[in-house]
C-alpha cells in the first residue's frame, strides 16, 4: 500500500455519517455520542460547550477525525498545522511508521500531509458537517464549538500566497468551492433544514496558534504573532517548547521519573527560545493583543525532541509526547503562571488525559487539547469520560490561572503513577501469531498464560457474583487456584490490554476471590469418578507440579500416587516461600481439592526408584522433584544457598538474625530472601546484582515490595570475597546484549566493599542430577526432556525446566495427564461467562484504576468478545468494524484513508500490522497494484477483484472458489457498507 491518503468527498462522507448514525447510533467508531449539557465557556468571542479537543496533529487532520472527536465531546479543535511545504513534498520527509504511542508517545510528523488547499477543504467540510449534525441530532448548540488554526513555521511562509490564502479562506470561506458544495450536499440530505443550512457562518476560524521550528529566533516568533494580531486580527496563541525549562531541569525531572533512557543533548535547549527573551516578548504581545481587543495566550507545550536510539522509529530524531511530557509541561505552566501572576492565558497540550484533566481545568488552564491518549485503545471515545469529569465543575470566563494549584500539580506529577515509568522495561504484549483476516478478536491475557486460562470468562462470572461457576471454570485448567491466586507470576497481567489504559486487570486477585468464595460449592459438587483400568501413575514430588498432575489424573479416574519426602505436600510454597507471601491454609486447600478425587499420598520418605515403581505396577511415572540444589557462587567466605537458608528461616520457631545480610542475585527468590532478612532483624539487607534494576529477572511488583521494605540495591557489582564483616565487590558496566536480550555485565577492574556478615547465593537453583542419573535419565541443559529417554517416564516443572513458575509447572502437569489419559480434557463454558458485545463496547475509552477484585469485571475489556484496538487507535478511521448478519464483528482496512502512520500496530495483540495484514478495501486498481495487502476492489455490478495469494477477478453472482468467510465479508460490505467505496 501507499502512505498517500485521499480526502473523502463531502457527499460520500455525509452518506457514511448519516447511514451509520441511523443504523448504529454511532459515527466513526464513537460508540456513545456526547450530548452537551447546555453549559458553555466563552473564548475568542465564541463559546465552547466543553474545554477539550484534539491537538494539532493526527487526530485533527481530516474531516472524519474532527467529526469523530466532536461526537465524543470535543468542542475546541486545533486543526493540524499548515505551512508552505505540503503534499507529496512534505510526505516524502515523514518516515513510516511515524507514530509510536504504546506508552509515552513519540512521533515524526510535521504539519499536514495534504496540500494546503486540501487541508482547508477538510476543515471546511468538518465545520459545515458539525454545524448541521449538532442541530439535527441534538448533540449540542451549533455555535458551541470553535476551530483554531495552527500555522507555521516562519513569517515568509505564512505571508506567502499559499498559507495567506488558507488563512483568509478560514476566516471567510464563503467564496470557496468547498463551502458552497457543503451547503448543497447538506441541503440535499436535510431539506427540512434548508433555511438553517443557508445561514451557516462561513467564518470557520477567528483564532490561530503559532507553531515554529526548533531554533526559531525570538524576533521571528514575535514578528509572526504581531502580524497575525495586527494584520489578520486573529486571537493568537504562541506555542512554546519544553526546552524553555533548560537542559538541567528537563534532564533531572525525566531521570527522577524513570525516563533516564530517553536521550537528548543540549543543542535544542541552547538554540530554542530562552526564558529571558520569552518573558518580555510575551508581555509585549499581550499588550498588543489588549490594544486590538484580541486575546493572546500561550500553548504549552510543543512536543519534545529526543534522539532515536532504540529503533523506536526510523530516522535519528523524534518528538516525545504523552505521560512523560506532562511533568515538563506542567512545570512550564507553573513558571509562566507565577511569572505573570496568573494573568497569562494557557492552552494546554502535553500529556493531558482523564486523570489530570479536572485539575488542569480547575486551575484555570483551558482549552485542553490531547493527542497521545486518544491514539491508544478507546481512541476518541476517551474524550467522553474526560468531558463528563469536568461537567460538574463551575464554568466561567477565563479570569486567571491558579499558580499555587499548578505548582502543586507539578510537584505531585513527579510521584504520580500515571506519569512514572516502571522500573523494569515492559515486555511485549503481542503474541507470536499473525492476525487472521477473519475472527481476529482474542484475549491477550489467555495467550500470556501458560495454561491458557479462560480469564475474561471467569472474571465475568465473578462480576455477576457467580463464584462457584467461576471457580469451576478456573479449575478446568488450573489445579491450584489458591496457590496461583496468591503467588502466581501472573504473566497474563503483563499482556492485559488495560495496561494501555491505566493498569492491568487484577487477574490474580480475582482468581483468589473466586477460590475463596466458590470453594465450598466446588468441593461439595465433586464426585470421584470410576477408576480407569490398566493405568496407574506414580508422581515423585509433592510440590505444585506434582499436586497438579495428581489432580488432573484423579479427575479423569486414573489411579495416582504422590511420593513426597517431606512430611507435607506443598514443596517450595510450603517450605521456602515466606509466610508473609503465602500461608499454609492456601496450600492446604489446594491439596484437599486434589485429594477429593481419591489420590493416594505418601509423605515422609524418599520415593522408590523408577525401576521399583514399574515393578509395583505403575504404568506412567512423573518426576516433579523441583530444583532444590543451590546455584554455585564461587567466592570465599560465609555463603549459604538461598533455598536451604530460606527453608531454615521458615521452619525455625523464632529465627533471628543480626549483622549484615547480602543476597546475590535478583530473581523473585532473591527478593523474598532479602525481605526475610530484613524482617528477621538483620542490621541491613542488600541485593547485589551484576546488571541494573531494569535487567533484574524479578517481577516488577516483587522488586518494588523489596525496595519499599528497605532492602538496599547495589547495582552493577559482582561479589569477589566475604571476610571480616565485609563483602568485596567489583564494579561492572553493561556491554552488548547476550542471548537473553539483556546487556552483558563487563568487569571494570574497580573494587569496593560493603558491610556483610552473611552472603545468600540466589543465582539460580539446579535440578538434582544424581536423582536423574540413578534412574538412567539423560540430562539436557537445564534438566531432562519432558518425555525422558526412559520409557513411560516424564519430567515436569522445575525438574524439567530449571527454576520456573508454578503455572508453568501446572502446564507440564496437564500435558503429562493428557499423555496418560490419551485425550485432552474437554469442558463447556456456561453462556453466563460471556459479556455481551454491548457490555464490552461500553467499557471502551473508560479509564478506571483497580480498587479490589470485586470491581475487576467492570474493568476487564472482554477482548475475546470485542477487541477492535486497531479501529480505536487509528486517527483516520481507516480500520472499520463490519457487522455480519450473524452478529460477528470483523475488521476491514480502508486503503484510501490510511497514511501508514503505524499506530495500529502497537495495539494489535498479534505479531501483525493491521494496516498491512488485515483484509483491505481498495478504491482503485492503481491502489491495489501499489499494495501487497490481501483485499478487494469493487469493479461495479457483481464483479470484484480480490487478492488472497494472487489477484483474481470474481463474479459474486456465480459459484466461485473464494473462501466462504471472505465472500461473506465482501457481500456484507457491498450490501450494508457501500458508502465505504462509493
Question: What is each model feature region?
Answer:
Residues 75-87, 240-242, 359-389, 691:
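Glycine-rich phosphate-binding active-site loops on the catalytic face of alpha/beta enzymes
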Residues 540-561, 602-611, 625-633, 645-700, ...:
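Rossmann-like dinucleotide/flavin-binding elements
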Residues 22-37, 242-342, 377-395:
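Glycine/Thr-rich beta-alpha phosphate-binding loop at enzyme active sites
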Residues 317, 323, 328, 374-375, ...:
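Ferredoxin-type iron-sulfur electron-transfer modules and their immediate structural context
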Residues 1-231:
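N-terminal capping/small domains of soluble enzymes
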Residues 602-616, 631, 716-726, 732-735:
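A conserved short coil-to-beta-strand element within the FAD-binding core of flavoproteins
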Residues 559-562, 566-601, 674-720:
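Rossmann-like dinucleotide-binding cores of NAD(P)H-dependent redox enzymes
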Residues 63-68, 352-370:
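Catalytic cores of alpha/beta
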Amino acid at each position: 500500500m501507499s502512505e498517500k491518503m485521499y480526502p473523502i468527498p463531502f457527499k460520500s462522507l455525509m452518506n457514511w455519517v448519516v447511514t451509520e448514525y441511523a443504523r448504529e447510533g454511532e459515527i466513526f467508531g464513537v460508540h456513545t455520542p456526547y450530548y452537551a449539557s447546555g453549559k458553555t465557556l466563552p473564548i475568542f468571542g465564541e463559546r465552547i460547550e466543553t474545554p477539550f479537543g484534539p491537538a494539532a496533529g493526527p487526530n485533527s487532520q481530516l474531516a472524519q477525525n474532527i467529526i469523530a472527536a466532536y461526537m465524543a465531546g470535543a468542542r475546541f479543535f486545533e486543526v493540524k498545522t499548515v505551512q508552505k511545504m505540503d503534499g507529496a513534498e512534505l510526505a516524502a520527509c515523514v518516515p513510516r511508521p511515524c507514530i509510536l504511542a504504546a506508552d509515552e508517545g513519540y512521533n515524526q510528523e510535521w504539519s499536514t500531509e495534504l496540500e494546503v488547499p486540501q487541508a482547508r477543504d477538510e476543515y471546511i467540510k468538518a465545520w459545515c458537517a458539525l454545524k448541521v449534525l449538532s442541530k439535527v441530532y441534538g448533540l449540542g448548540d451549533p455555535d458551541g464549538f470553535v476551530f483554531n488554526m495552527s500555522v507555521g513555521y516562519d513569517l515568509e511562509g505564512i505571508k506567502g500566497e499559499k498559507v495567506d490564502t488558507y488563512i483568509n479562506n478560514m476566516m471567510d470561506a464563503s467564496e470557496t468551492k468547498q463551502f458552497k458544495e457543503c451547503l448543497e450536499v447538506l441541503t440535499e440530505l436535510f431539506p427540512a433544514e434548508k433555511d438553517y443550512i443557508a445561514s451557516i457562518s462561513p467564518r470557520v476560524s477567528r483564532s490561530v496558534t503559532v507553531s515554529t521550528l526548533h531554533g526559531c529566533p525570538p524576533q521571528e516568533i514575535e514578528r509572526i504573532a504581531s502580524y497575525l494580531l495586527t494584520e489578520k486580527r486573529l486571537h493568537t496563541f504562541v506555542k512554546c517548547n519544553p526546552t524553555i525549562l533548560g537542559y538541567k531541569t528537563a534532564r533531572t525531572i525525566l531521570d527522577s521519573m524513570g525516563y533516564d533512557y530517553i536521550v537528548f543533548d543540549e543543542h535544542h535547549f541552547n538554540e530554542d527560545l530562552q526564558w529571558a527573551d520569552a518573558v518580555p516578548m510575551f508581555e509585549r504581545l499581550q499588550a498588543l493583543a489588549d490594544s486590538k481587543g484580541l486575546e493572546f495566550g500561550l500553548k504549552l507545550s510543543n512536543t519534545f525532541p529526543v534522539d532515536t536510539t532504540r529503533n523506536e522509529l526510523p530516522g535519528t530524531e523524534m518528538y516525545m509526547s504523552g505521560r512523560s511530557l506532562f511533568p515538563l509541561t506542567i512545570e512550564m505552566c507553573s513558571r509562566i503562571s507565577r511569572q505573570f501572576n496568573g494573568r497569562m492565558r494557557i492552552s494546554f497540550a502535553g500529556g493531558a488525559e482523564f486523570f489530570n484533566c479536572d485539575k488542569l481545568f480547575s486551575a484555570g488552564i483551558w482549552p485542553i487539547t490531547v493527542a497521545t491518549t486518544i491514539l491508544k485503545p478507546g481512541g476518541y471515545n476517551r474524550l467522553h469520560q474526560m468531558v463528563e469529569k469536568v461537567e460538574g465543575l463551575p464554568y466561567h470566563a477565563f479570569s486567571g490561572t491558579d499558580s499555587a494549584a499548578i505548582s502543586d500539580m507539578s510537584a505531585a506529577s513527579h510521584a504520580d503513577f500515571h506519569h512514572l515509568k516502571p522500573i523494569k522495561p515492559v515486555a511485549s504484549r503481542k503474541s507470536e501469531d499473525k492476525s487472521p483476516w477473519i475472527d481476529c478478536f482474542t484475549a491477550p491475557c489467555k495467550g500470556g498464560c501458560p495454561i491458557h486460562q479462560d480469564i475474561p470468562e471467569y472474571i465475568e462470572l465473578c462480576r455477576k457474583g457467580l463464584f462457584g461457576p467461576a471457580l469451576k471454570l478456573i479449575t478446568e485448567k488450573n489445579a491450584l487456584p489458591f496457590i496461583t491466586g496468591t503467588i502466581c507470576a501472573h504473566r497474563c497481567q503483563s499482556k492485559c490490554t488495560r495496561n494501555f489504559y491505566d493498569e492491568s486487570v487484577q487477574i490474580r486477585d480475582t482468581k483468589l476471590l473466586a477460590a475463596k468464595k466458590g470453594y465450598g460449592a466446588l468441593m461439595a459438587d465433586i464426585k470421584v469418578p470410576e477408576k480407569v483400568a490398566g493405568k496407574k501413575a506414580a508422581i515423585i514430588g509433592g510440590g505444585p507440579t506434582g499436586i497438579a498432575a495428581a489432580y488432573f489424573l484423579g479427575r479423569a479416574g486414573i489411579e495416582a500416587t504422590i511420593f513426597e519426602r517431606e512430611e507435607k505436600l506443598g514443596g517450595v510454597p510450603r517450605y521456602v516461600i515466606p509466610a508473609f507471601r503465602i500461608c499454609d491454609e492456601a496450600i492446604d486447600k489446594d491439596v484437599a481439592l486434589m485429594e477429593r478425587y481419591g489420590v493416594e499420598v505418601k509423605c515422609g520418605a524418599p520415593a522408590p526408584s523408577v525401576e521399583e515403581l514399574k515393578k509395583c505396577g505403575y504404568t506412567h511415572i512423573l518426576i516433579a522433584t523441583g530444583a532444590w540444589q543451590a546455584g554455585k557462587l564461587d567466592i570465599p567466605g560465609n555463603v549459604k544457598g538461598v533455598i536451604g537458608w530460606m527453608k531454615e528461616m521458615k521452619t525455625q520457631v523464632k529465627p533471628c538474625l543480626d549483622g549484615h545480610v547480602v543476597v546475590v542475585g535478583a530473581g523473585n527468590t532473591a527478593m523474598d530472601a532479602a525481605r526475610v532478612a530484613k524482617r528477621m532483624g538483620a542490621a541491613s539487607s542488600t541485593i547485589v546484582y551484576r546488571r541494573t534494576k531494569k535487567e533484574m529477572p524479578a517481577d516488577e511488583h516483587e522488586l518494588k515490595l523489596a525496595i519499599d521494605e528497605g532492602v538496599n540495591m547495589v547495582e552493577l557489582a559482582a561479589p569477589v570475597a566475604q571476610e571480616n564483616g565485609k563483602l568485596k565487590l567489583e564494579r561492572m558496566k553493561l556491554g552488548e546484549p547476550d542471548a537473553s536480550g539483556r546487556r552483558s555485565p563487563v568487569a571494570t577492574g574497580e573494587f569496593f566493599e560493603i558491610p556483610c556478615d552473611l552472603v545468600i547465593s540466589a543465582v539460580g537453583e539446579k535440578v538434582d542430577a544424581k536423582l536423574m542419573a540413578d534412574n538412567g535419565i539423560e540430562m539436557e541443559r537445564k534438566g531432562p526432556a519432558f518425555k525422558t529417554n526412559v520409557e513411560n517416564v516424564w519430567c515436569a516443572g522445575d525438574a524439567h525446566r530449571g527454576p520456573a513458575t508454578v503455572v508453568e509447572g501446572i502446564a507440564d502437569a496437564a500435558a503429562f495427564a493428557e499423555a496418560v489419559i490419551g485425550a485432552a480434557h474437554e469442558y463447556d463454558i456456561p453462556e453466563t461467562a460471556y459479556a455481551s458485545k454491548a457490555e464490552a463496547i461500553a467499557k471502551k475509552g473508560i479509564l478506571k484504576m483497580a480498587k479490589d477484585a470485586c470491581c475487576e469485571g467492570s474493568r476487564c475489556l472482554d477482548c475475546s468478545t470485542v477487541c477492535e484496538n486497531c479501529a480505536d487507535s487509528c486517527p483516520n478511521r481507516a480500520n472499520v468494524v463490519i457487522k455480519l448478519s450473524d452478529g460477528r464483528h470483523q475488521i476491514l482496512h480502508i486503503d484510501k484513508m490510511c497514511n501508514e502512520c503505524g499506530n495500529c500496530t502497537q495495539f494489535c495483540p498479534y505479531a501483525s500490522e493491521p494496516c498491512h495484514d488485515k483484509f483491505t478495501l481498495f478504491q482503485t486498481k492503481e491502489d491495489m497494484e501499489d499494495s501487497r495487502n490481501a483485499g478487494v476492489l469493487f469493479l461495479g455490478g457483481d464483479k470484484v477483484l480480490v487478492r488472497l495469494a494472487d489477484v483474481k477477478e470474481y463474479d459474486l453472482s456465480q459459484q466461485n472458489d473464494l473462501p466462504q468467510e471472505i465472500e461473506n465479508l465482501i457481500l456484507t460490505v457491498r450490501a450494508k457498507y457501500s458508502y465505504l467505496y462509493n
